[in-house]
């Protein structure tokens, strides 16, 4: 097995486990609360379909926000309540509107992620639950890249597809993913990437409580060791999942 295949295997396992954990937490929140759910970065509504399969989630409990108009149209064609909006701006919902808000692989794409999290706290009901999945900038792999004079693979990313490709150490993302960092509204460019400790601290500053974090993918260690290492050192894992209650 070559190094690229090895790291791709690590990445695929990391994302599978991280998304699995996040979805489990969303399902738990929805099972214990009758409130509505807000999907931030809803796309075509794929998460509704997942939650509907798991929980038979009613359509009238689901609301999504998505900035890309064609994806909004596709979601609405499925009968979903998905609104076109910019998560960098104020959320157009009243205070305490939702029992659960989630943002999976969204925070790192925002120019104003702190403002977004403040808005999430505002629109959550008392006892409401936030679930976040986002990459961690504070990893051993990132430290090695910086010491080698490179930029973090987790971002922030420069606005040059050619430069990113030139600097890429291992290609681990889906081959079908098209580079788009040079357009005005990129989907895949990372702008602000938190560390585990800083994100947890900011959630606490906002007034969230019962904040629980999990890390996934402690590179470059092999997959068989990951479950143990992730429990020992979640602070330096590639992906992090946070669950917090208002």
Go through each PLM region and give its residues.
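Conserved N-terminal segment of class I S-adenosyl-L-methionine
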Residues: 1-94, 100-104, 192, 215-226, ...
């Amino acid at each position: 097995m070559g190094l690229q295949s090895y790291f791709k295997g690590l990445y695929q396992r990391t994302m599978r486990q991280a998304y699995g954990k996040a979805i489990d937490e969303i399902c738990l929140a929805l099972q214990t609360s009758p409130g509505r759910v807000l999907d931030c970065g809803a796309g075509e509504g794929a998460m509704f379909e997942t939650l509907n399969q798991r929980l038979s989630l009613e359509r009238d409990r689901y609301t999504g926000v998505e900035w890309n108009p064609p994806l909004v149209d596709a979601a609405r064609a499925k009968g979903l309540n998905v609104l076109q909006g910019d998560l960098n701006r104020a959320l157009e919902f009243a205070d305490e509107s939702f029992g659960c808000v989630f943002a999976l692989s969204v925070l790192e794409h925002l120019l104003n992620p702190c403002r977004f999290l403040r808005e999430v706290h505002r629109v959550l009901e008392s006892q409401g639950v936030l679930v976040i999945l986002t990459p961690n900038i504070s990893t051993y792999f990132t430290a090695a890249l910086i010491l080698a004079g490179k930029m973090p693979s987790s971002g922030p990313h420069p606005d040059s597809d050619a430069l990113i490709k030139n600097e890429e150490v291992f290609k681990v993302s889906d081959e079908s993913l098209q580079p788009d960092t040079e357009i005005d509204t990129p989907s895949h460019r990372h702008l602000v990437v938190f560390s585990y400790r800083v994100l947890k601290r900011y959630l606490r500053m906002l007034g969230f409580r019962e904040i629980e974090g999990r890390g996934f993918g402690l590179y470059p260690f092999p997959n068989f060791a990951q479950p143990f290492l992730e429990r020992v050192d979640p602070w330096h894992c590639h992906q992090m999942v946070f669950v917090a209650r208002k």
